[in-house]
Regions:
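Donor nucleotide-sugar binding/catalytic pocket of nucleotide-sugar-dependent glycosyltransferases
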Residues: 121-178
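Conserved donor-binding/catalytic core segment of Leloir-type glycosyltransferases
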Residues: 167-171, 181-213, 221-222
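Short alpha-helical donor nucleotide-sugar binding micro-motif in glycosyltransferases
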Residues: 260-265
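Aromatic "clamp/platform" in nucleotide-sugar-dependent glycosyltransferases that forms part
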Residues: 273
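Nucleotide-activated donor-binding/catalytic signature segment of Leloir-type glycosyltransferases, i.e.
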Residues: 225, 233-256, 267
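Short alpha-helical segment that forms part of, or immediately flanks, the ligand-binding pocket
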Residues: 259, 277, 282-286
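Active-site proximal beta-strand in glycosyltransferases
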Residues: 64, 81-101, 115-120, 124-128, ...
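Short hydrophobic beta-strand element within catalytic cores of glycosyltransferases
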Residues: 290-294
Length: 295
């Protein structure tokens, strides 16, 4: 089977998911993707470029797989009639209805509606966790209340009926070659390996660390994770306060070095306010870190 995998947001967990699918699927995965350029622009502007990229795809496509950042109706109209009759599957890494907003920023319903239309256009929706699916289905009727005239709720059941849960695959074998190094630690090593962004709630993470430090508890830190977004000031303050106890600071490009860091950590922490299936936390657990995560 030839599967065209469309990813307008080729970064982080989206990137890991697609690369894992390419590597391990028994089907022929044909990826077209765009690099990270901001959520709003990708949801608005991705379809024109992606539709153009399909002209280079010569294979007969049996299934269309798109991510939740795709403007599916626009993509289908710009490529019509090529993909009109084949099954269309959308993988819901996240949704625009419940994703937290930065402080002082209101949710723009435009992107909820783009997400909503794309879900209606897909034949099957795959959510990354049961919590994610339930969280979205709870928020959808509240969104439909915003309609200024006739309010149609039948799409809620329609979307629910074509939704399933399938956890993203994890490529963990790449961590097996690394030897466990945590026995060499003089102090407990606490790991942060998620995005440096507000929805990961770094303020709470460092607030707890500061309290531990205030009562003279000693620990070392590995502060890794994706840093291409705007860096919260908490990380710079942490460098000033804990510099000599920070064994790594910043994104890790090299896979071997990343594996070495995870195999030297004792505890991995998430304080995220918005998370459905954190690949980074799973990787750290696989490498032997004890998880402290939200309920």
């Amino acid at each position: 089977m030839n599967i065209l995998a469309v990813e307008p947001f080729f970064s982080g967990s989206h990137k890991a998911f697609l690369k894992g699918l390419e590597k391990y699927s028994r089907h022929n995965i044909i990826p077209i993707n765009l690099s990270y350029k901001g959520r709003k622009w990708r949801m608005h502007g991705n379809s024109v470029v992606l539709a153009g990229m399909t002209q280079e795809v010569e294979e007969e496509i049996d299934l269309l797989l798109v991510s939740s950042m795709t403007n599916l109706p626009a993509f289908l109209s710009l490529t019509n009639p090529r993909f009109a009759e084949i099954p269309k599957v959308m993988y819901m890494h996240e949704n625009q209805f419940t994703q937290p907003m930065p402080e002082g920023e209101e949710r723009d319903q435009t992107y909820c509606y783009l997400n909503y239309l794309s879900m209606l256009s897909a034949d099957r929706l795959i959510f990354s966790s049961e919590f994610h699916r339930n969280d979205f289905l709870k928020a959808l009727p509240e969104f439909l209340e915003n309609y200024p005239d006739d309010k149609y709720y039948y799409p809620v059941d329609k979307i629910a009926d074509k939704s399933i849960v399938l956890y993203p695959g994890l490529d963990l074998k790449r961590f097996d070659a690394q030897v466990d190094q945590r026995n060499e630690n003089e102090n407990p090593v606490i790991v942060w390996n998620q995005r440096w962004q507000f929805d990961r709630n770094p303020a709470m993470f460092f607030r707890v660390l500061n309290r531990l430090n205030d009562i003279d508890l000693t620990f070392d830190l590995i502060l890794a994770g994706d840093t291409q977004h705007e860096k919260p000031e908490e990380f710079e303050k942490a460098w000033e306060r804990y510099g000599r106890h920070i064994t790594h600071f910043g994104y890790v490009e090299d896979r071997e070095n990343y594996s070495r860091l995870l195999h030297s950590g004792d505890i991995v922490v998430s304080t995220a306010t918005y998370e459905f299936f954190c690949v980074a936390i799973m990787e750290a657990i696989y490498c032997g870190c004890h998880p402290l995560v939200p309920n």
